[in-house]
């Protein structure tokens, strides 16, 4: 009888676990790229290209100053799917217009926030969206990019600052030559700035970058550890105290920092995190 009860309890627990995690798929217009978003204990996304894994399940989250973490045990309240195929004028680009063609998936969560994913023929992107009407601070963001193997990456390290001291490295000129190494060989004591490229093999490259950056710190990356075969995001905390300095006293130098990375006063969308997929010539 006891064995029967234990077996029944285990079966119920497994069933609950399976039911608790919801998955949503989003394909690019040409169908070659597919993103799988999972909402279970954590919020993750994975990407395949022509059926081959490009990104393993990678967690994403925002932690607020009230202790809430958007992405931890997320509860989906609604799902919206849209598509777009329009033209954007680009008078200062190498072409006078750009085709904006994508499929989108928006997960509306309980708790005044959403996460939006877009799938293009040449990449995927996601961003958080706040519906909160009261001001709050963002303490931290988790932006991980986990790959299926110890792949080769070509990255620009921050050139100045003390080894292992990210706060010192935040003050930099975003200038350096690129270094090529396996993910596990990337220096965990130095920040990397964007864009950077990971070689997924068979001529496929993955370019990590961001866009729509406003009133928010820029994304740096660092080695996430060999076991994870990936990169994790690092963000500069909000300035507390600044003073004039630097070359010819032209810069404002941050001397002290607050315990959060961003202030949010009104409903808004946050920066896009992007994984562009293509060949070397596609990325040029």
PLM features: what roles do these ranges have?
Residues 1-22:
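Bacterial Sec-dependent N-terminal signal peptides
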Residues 23-284:
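N-terminal accessory beta-strand-rich subdomains and adjacent acidic, glycine-rich linkers
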């Amino acid at each position: 009888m006891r064995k029967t009860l234990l077996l029944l309890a285990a079966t119920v627990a497994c069933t609950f676990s399976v039911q608790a995690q919801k998955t949503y798929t989003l394909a690019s217009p040409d169908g070659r790229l597919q993103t799988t978003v999972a909402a279970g204990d954590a919020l993750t996304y994975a990407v395949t290209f022509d059926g081959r894994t490009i990104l393993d399940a990678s967690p994403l989250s925002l932690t607020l100053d009230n202790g809430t973490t958007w992405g931890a045990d997320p509860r989906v309240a609604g799902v919206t799917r849209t598509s777009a195929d329009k033209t954007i004028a680009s008078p200062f680009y190498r072409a006078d217009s750009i085709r904006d063609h994508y499929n989108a998936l928006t997960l509306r969560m309980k708790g005044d926030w959403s996460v939006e994913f877009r799938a293009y023929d040449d990449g995927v992107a996601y961003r958080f969206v706040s519906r909160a009407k009261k001001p709050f601070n963002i303490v931290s963001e988790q932006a991980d990019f986990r790959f299926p193997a110890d792949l080769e990456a070509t990255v620009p390290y921050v050139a100045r600052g003390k080894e292992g001291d990210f706060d010192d490295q935040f003050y930099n000129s975003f200038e350096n030559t690129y270094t090529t190494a396996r993910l596990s060989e990337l220096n965990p004591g130095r920040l990397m700035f964007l864009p950077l490229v990971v070689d997924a093999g068979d001529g496929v490259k993955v370019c990590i970058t961001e866009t729509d950056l406003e009133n928010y710190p820029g994304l740096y990356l660092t080695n996430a550890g060999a076991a994870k075969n990936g990169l994790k995001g690092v963000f500069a905390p909000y300035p507390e105290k600044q003073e004039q300095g630097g070359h010819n006293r032209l810069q404002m130098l941050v001397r002290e920092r607050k315990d959060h990375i961003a202030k949010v006063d009104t409903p808004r969308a946050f920066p896009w995190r992007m994984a562009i997929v293509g060949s070397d010539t596609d990325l040029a």
